[in-house]
Structure formats: C-alpha cells, structure tokens
Amino acid sequence: MSSPVLHALNGSASFFARLNTPQPEPTDASSLPAFFARAYSLENDGMVMCIVTIAVTVLLELLPGSVSGVRKLLKSKGGPKLYAQGVLYNFLNNGVLGPPVYELVCNQWVSPPFSAVDRVAMVFAIIVGHSIGYYCAHRWMHTRTMYWAHRFHHRFNVVVVPVSANAVSLVEYIIAYMLPFVVGAALLRPDRLSLFAAVGLRVS
C-alpha cells in the first residue's frame, strides 16, 4: 500500500481518531479548483471510502464463486463489453462522482463529534432514511419516464457478479445512491464518524 494511503489510514493517529475529530474548515471555500483538489485527495474521507469500496469489490470479484460467474459472463454474447462497462461505471460512480459529493456534504452539513449513543442513533437514522430514499428512487426508475436510467443495471439479470452492485448509470447513481445521503445529511447533520459509518454500512 502506498505511503499516502498509509498516511491517510494511520498517520500519527489511527483513521478512527481522524474521524473522531471535527471536519477541517476548507482553506479556500470559494475556489472550485481547491475544492476538487481536496475532494480527490486522501484528506477527504470520501476518497478513502472510494478506495475501500473499490478494493472490497475487487476482493469479492476474486472469490471462487465470483470468478466462475465472471467467466460465465465473459463467455456469453456481449458479456465482455457488458463486464467492461460495469467496471467502468464502478470507477466513474465511486471514484469520480462520489468524492466531490462527499466533500460537499462534509463542508456543509457535518456536525462536531457526537457521543457514542448519539452516533449509533445517527447511523441508524441515516441508513433508514437512505433505504427509504433508495426505495422511492428505485420505484421511480421502474416507470416509463425513468427506466432509461435504470436499464443498464438490469443487463446483469442473468449473471450477477459483485461489480454489478455499483454498475448503474450515472443518473441512477446520483438519484438513487447519492441523493438520499445528501438529503439525509442536510436534514440530520451527522458528525464525521457517523456519516462515514453509515455510508460504509449502506454500500457494503
């Protein structure tokens, strides 16, 4: 593992200790280049979440049961292209869209550290809220108006592999996966650790 990642996860203190501190104030809140530079750096907890999510997906893909599924998919008609598109959407969704949105939430709606009890309650509330939001968005995606945004995900209906979990269109990822977290954070104002734990549990 590279030294920047080690520094992000360990550094002079543990990553847990980092999440247990207040969200640092952005040095230049009005600068878009500075915002995106931080969003795509390991100073952003969302970038760490991105790396962990992709790493876990890769590990799951390497399990014996998953490998056989991938082989079956690659042997099917159009399978190699579909799998490549699924991998691409995983990187676009988790690695391109995710970090800036996470950084925005942390800058705007994250509270100072909570007590342990409040954190448990907050994680539960965020997960429940996200589940409701995802359910409503998913129902909407199955209407004639929005099915175009959901169609790609259903191309994995014969062979389901771990990468298919986040193999959704950019529009679906924004509306069904991310928007419920953004709205939940804006309404509930979680602390840094609660947000990270809720997102981690929900995407796992």
Protein language model regions, located:
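Functionally important transmembrane alpha-helices
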Residues: 189-204
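Non-catalytic, topology-defining segments of multipass membrane proteins
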Residues: 1-193
